[in-house]
Amino acid sequence: VSKKNYPVEATEWILQNLDVKNIKLFNEYNYGSYLLYKGVPVFIDSRADLYAPEFNGKRAENGEYDGRDIFTDFIKTSSMERYYEDTFEKYDITHIILKKKSKLNTFISNDSGFLEMYNDDNFVVYERCK
C-alpha cells in the first residue's frame, strides 16, 4: 500500500489514539475504503452509490427519497463550493483526515476551530473544536 496515496501511518495513529467507536470522521473519497478496511468508520468511500439518498433514506409518496445526499455534500465540501463547517455541523463531524495538499486542508489548517492532532509527509488529522 502506497503511503503517498493511502493514510497508512495516520490510520495507525487514529486506531491507537482515538476511540473510533465515538468519532465521526470526515475523510476524502479516494482512501475511505482503506480506512474502513482497517476498522475506522468513514464519511465516504469508493462505493459512491451507497451515499446517495436512494440508499440511506425512504421513498416518499411523490417518488423522491428523503435520505441524505452524502456524496453531493462531500463533493461540494471538498471543492469548497460549500462552506465546510456547514457540512461538519450537519453530520456532527468530530475529526477530519485530509491529504496535506488538498484544497480543503489549505483552509482548515488556518482555521482556529480545528486542532491538528497528527501529521506526516502526506496526511493530517484534525479534531474539530466545537
Label each PLM-derived region with a short phrase.
Residues 1-130:
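Extracytoplasmic
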